Amino acid sequence: MKRAAAEILHEYGPFPGAERVHGVTFDGQHVWFASGDKLNAFDPASGQAVRAIDVAAHAGTAFDGRHLFQIAEDRIQKIDPQTGQVLATIPAPGGGTDSGLAWAEGTLWVGQYRGRKIHQIDPETGAILRTIESHRFVTGVTWVEGELWHGTWEGDESDLTRVDPQTGAVLERLDLPSGVMVSGLESDGADRFFCGGGSSGKVRAVRRPRS
């Protein structure tokens, strides 16, 4: 297993009206984050907030290229980012204990926080296709170039962990500074992760290592 200190490249926020950051995703242009009763978008080039959608947004957030997916209590909502309309709803596998959310080549990966699990599910039905175990509490989840990464938070320590999506074996860890929490997690598809900062109200960009 490879292990290194995480390199924080930039901090965004806190943002007006958003006391906490839950899920985080990236639509290719804007970073979206969940703040409880809203989905908020900002421009990572300028750090400026650009829009918000009034919708329940309690945990993980994902983007499939067209739609946003958002955990709200015990369900996952499919949302049209143009109109803010909820198009469909499926049950969340953790029944309200869910954390991170990631779109991955036709399926969703869903973190289960205290259960220390990550479920791969069918985005149409919510059916669980696979479950892998984590070594710590699971926060955000992201999928990039065939790699499955998730955030952890336990004992006042956080890291970004890359795991084998078949077995759950830990392949790589990036340790964040003590007290820096990772809530949501997303990749920009290249060299950065966007990490939700929980009650700090911030989103941090962290360098993604290239193997």
Residue ranges and their predicted role:
Residues 15-28, 55-65, 93-105, 135-146, ...:
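Beta-rich, blade/repeat-based domains predominating
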Residues 8-15, 47-53, 85-91, 127-132, ...:
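A short beta-strand motif characteristic of beta-propeller blades
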Residues 40-41, 77, 119, 161, ...:
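WD40 beta-propeller blade core
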Residues 36-44:
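Beta-propeller domains
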Residues 31-37, 68-74, 110-115, 150-155, ...:
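Conserved beta-strand positions in repeat-built beta-propeller and related beta-rich domains
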Residues 182-211:
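Blade-level signature of beta-propeller repeat domains, shared across WD40, Kelch, NHL, RCC1
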Residues 1-7:
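Blade/loop signatures of beta-propeller domains
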Residues 43-47, 80-84, 122-126, 164-168, ...:
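Short loop/turn segments that connect beta-strands within beta-propeller blades
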